[in-house]
Amino acid sequence: MSEVRIRPRQVLILIIVFLVVLMMVHRNGKRTCQGPEYLQAMFVQGDTLPTIYAVTPTYPRPAQKAELTRLSHLFMLLPHLHWIIVEDTNATTPLVRNLLDRAGLEKRSTLLNIKTPSEFKLKGKDPNWIKPRGVEQRNLALAWLRNHVDVDRHSIVFFMDDDNSYSTELFAEMSKIERGRVGVWPVGLVGGLMVERPLLTEDGTKVTGFNAAWRPERPFPIDMAAFAISMDLFIRNPQATFSYEVQRGYQESEILRHLTTRDQLQPLANRCTDVLVWHTRTEKTKLAAEEALLKKGQRSDGGMEV
């Protein structure tokens, strides 16, 4: 049998090829993300960060898919978020199911549904503040969380309305919430102010009050987007739910009074000086031309999902 000789140069080439292939496999198997450092860190450390359960009540309306599509992009970017969508319907809808499927979020989402009692539904031209909204939906989400979340693993609950605007950096801050704490931060464009924010001690470690202009006497005069809650607090306080029986603007205080006190709040967002969420609201859709078509038995979106 003839002897096979491999020259040193051939050995070197084989080693180089092997190393290149190894680097490519390693690179393809590793999570990568382009963007600011906090986003890269969250992307790489997603498996070690506390899961953030974002609870979004939603209801059928012309802009619903647009609102949820915008929010879905946050979840695509942030691997440690789990989206709990609760529809105000008698059954979950194809529109929301299709949206989650197209966004690739089926494994990082939970879709629930419960109808708001008719006596608490807005009617006609009712202003959106006249009745409490999302009470049934948020309470159903809390019941699901108490029954399904691993109590031994730290996780966080955030009530995420579908029409607000959120920076990805907000969720980096939220990930810092300690067990047994409620994290707080400023919210822009709310309560008649450019920003509502907690007021802190000089060292920035304690909340001493709030700058709220509307009903500042509330126990917690903050917006629903201004806080997130360590899940263990909900486990230890099963009575913590939202209620129809509270005054207008007191839903936040109603849930927080069961869970914490002002002096136990955890200030975040650079000592509550960074605005990372805005209380925006989509203008009511004007569809006069569509209504004229419907009167003729026609529609612009026949066979389409808008």
Curated annotation (Swiss-Prot):
Keyword entries, A-Z: Glycoprotein, Golgi apparatus, Manganese, Membrane, Metal-binding, Signal-anchor, Transferase, Transmembrane, Transmembrane helix
Lumenal side: 30-306
Pathway: Protein modification; protein glycosylation
Gene Ontology BP terms: carbohydrate metabolic process; chondroitin sulfate proteoglycan biosynthetic process; glycosaminoglycan-protein linkage region biosynthetic process; heparan sulfate proteoglycan biosynthetic process
Pfam family, one: Glyco_transf_43
Lipid bilayer topology: Single-pass type II membrane protein
Transmembrane intervals: 12-29
EC number, as in UniProt: 2.4.1.135
Chief site of localization: Golgi
One Gene Ontology CC term in the entry: Golgi membrane
Keyword Glycoprotein: yes
Binding-site list for Mn(2+): 163
Top-level taxon of the source organism: Eukaryota
Reaction equation(s) it catalyzes: 3-O-(beta-D-galactosyl-(1->3)-beta-D-galactosyl-(1->4)-beta-D-xylosyl)-L-seryl-[protein] + UDP-alpha-D-glucuronate = 3-O-(beta-D-GlcA-(1->3)-beta-D-Gal-(1->3)-beta-D-Gal-(1->4)-beta-D-Xyl)-L-seryl-[protein] + UDP + H(+)
SUPFAM superfamilies: Nucleotide-diphospho-sugar transferases
Chain's role: Involved in the biosynthesis of L2/HNK-1 carbohydrate epitope on both glycolipids and glycoproteins. Shows strict specificity for Gal-beta-1,3-Gal-beta-1,4-Xyl, exhibiting negligible incorporation into other galactoside substrates.
Protein's name in the database: Galactosylgalactosylxylosylprotein 3-beta-glucuronosyltransferase I
Gene name for this UniProt entry: GlcAT-I
